[in-house]
């Protein structure tokens, strides 16, 4: 039914907004953890500068990185609030909706072949086609003869005549009878026009359904391709990039504090570390959003 199509679309919109809020919360956590590392970097740079071990340029670079990251944190806060406002509006709440997940995780998806007829869109289309076929049958009824049935009866109470009426015309006494009439249409022009219009409407609906089925099939294949690509990216950043990012941040701070690498090298390490973590979150969000699109196309809730 149309209600099922609308309900599925609304539920999918809510899910998409919810997991977008979860993603924005994950980005905020990454940036806030990076802010902690940059604060340590700035402290070390300041100590080394005061001790005369480095030039002021190193301290200025550390301060710049920390300020830039704080601006990114502020922007992430705003993006999270925007996502939460959208989610609150979709669920009809006046309060801010907080994601319950502490971290961004991949959604479950079981691969299945696409069958348009089993989706809410397909079922609604089938209902529309049945209704159009019924309209054709109703229009054809105008060619058939019409039957009418009426009941006639007479009841005379001989002992009661308060108005002293002449009852000679009722000498037949009491009786009950039926009358049956048959109406045969003599002109079929209007009926033919109705049948033609109903058939045309049925053909248009059938063509529209066929086009929609092809479009949904293309959307499914496109979404499947995007989902597989996003999963490959997520797998890399989750299995290799995440571990590498953590090791880079820890090892870089240790080597910099011991003077084994320059501040420029450490800046590159920090930048690559946060890029890997943010790319992991972005790839995972892309994958989850693709899963939600697949669920909507397949009619899953």
Please describe what each predicted stretch is.
Residues 1-7, 57, 61, 140-144, ...:
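Sec/SRP-type N-terminal targeting helices
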Residues 3, 7-120, 223, 230, ...:
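Periplasmic alpha-helical coiled-coil/stalk elements that build and connect Gram-negative outer-membrane
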Residues 21, 87, 125, 149, ...:
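Hydrophobic/aromatic residues within transmembrane alpha-helices of membrane transport systems
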Residues 68-93, 244-300:
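Short segments within alpha-helical structural elements
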Residues 91-156, 161:
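Amphipathic alpha-helical coiled-coil scaffold segments and their short linker/junction regions
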Residues 153-157, 184-188, 298:
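Transmembrane beta-strands of outer-membrane beta-barrel pores
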Residues 161-169:
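Flexible, solvent-exposed loop segments that connect beta-strands
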């Amino acid at each position: 039914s149309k209600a099922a199509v609308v309900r599925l679309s609304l539920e999918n919109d809510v899910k998409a907004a919810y997991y977008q809020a979860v993603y924005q919360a994950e980005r905020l956590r990454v940036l806030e953890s990076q802010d902690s590392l940059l604060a340590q970097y700035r402290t070390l740079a300041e100590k080394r500068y005061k001790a005369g071990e480095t030039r002021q340029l190193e301290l200025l670079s550390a301060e710049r990185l920390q300020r830039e990251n704080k601006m990114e944190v502020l922007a992430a806060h705003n993006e999270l609030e925007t996502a939460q406002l959208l989610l609150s509006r979709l669920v009809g709440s006046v309060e801010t909706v907080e994601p319950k997940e502490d971290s961004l995780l991949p959604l479950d998806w079981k691969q299945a072949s696409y069958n348009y007829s089993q989706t809410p869109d397909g079922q609604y289309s089938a209902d529309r086609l049945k209704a159009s076929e019924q309209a054709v049958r109703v229009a054809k009824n105008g060619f058939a003869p019409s039957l009418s049935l009426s009941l006639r009866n007479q009841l005379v109470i001989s002992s009661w005549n308060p108005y002293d009426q002449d009852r000679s015309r009722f000498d037949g006494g009491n009786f009950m009878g039926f009358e049956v009439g048959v109406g045969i249409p003599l002109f079929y022009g209007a009926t033919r026009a109705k049948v033609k219009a109903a058939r045309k409407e049925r053909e248009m609906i059938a063509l529209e359904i066929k086009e929609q089925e092809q479009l949904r099939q293309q959307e499914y294949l496109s979404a499947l391709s995007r989902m597989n690509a996003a999963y490959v990216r997520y797998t890399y950043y989750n299995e290799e990039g995440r571990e590498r990012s953590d090791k880079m941040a820890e090892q870089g701070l240790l080597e910099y504090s011991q003077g084994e690498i320059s501040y420029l090298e450490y800046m590159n390490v920090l930048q690559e570390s946060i890029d890997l973590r943010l790319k992991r979150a972005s790839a995972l969000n892309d994958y989850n959003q693709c899963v939600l699109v697949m669920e909507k196309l397949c009619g899953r809730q």
